């Protein structure tokens, strides 16, 4: 996805609530420049004004003014990582997932708008490749890896992404031959309600 298209998608997402609040204008597209040529794959809008973007070269951007300006709030030392999913709880708290084989799959969390980040998970299994994450609420979430030993691997957090544990895979159907997650935009694992998850 090009920078312009990601910015346009964000503008549309931010424009729809304006109509819902009675301003009376139909949804429209508005280009919001980010000031970078990074390829963005993750988007989390938490309000009309506040949103987060995550993409290549370990880049995380944040806006607090509806996309007029963007701040680079990337985790230090992450320039070789590919961020493909970001889940934000508000303007200060977010969790971002880097994809890749082995140690390239990582999770970071910020509690101060990206001023500082903590690495909360680094994959140590060379067979695992984490694709996406989702949250039920501000504490409970899951992350999904491509199959390991014939079944998708799932991580779980109970503290908002500050720590993660691999869940047992008993009861999970075997993956089909060649089946894997799609590591872009964070849509291969989606929470629905307080305990259900869709996996694709």
Predicted segments — roles?
Residues 4-13:
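Bacterial N-terminal signal peptides
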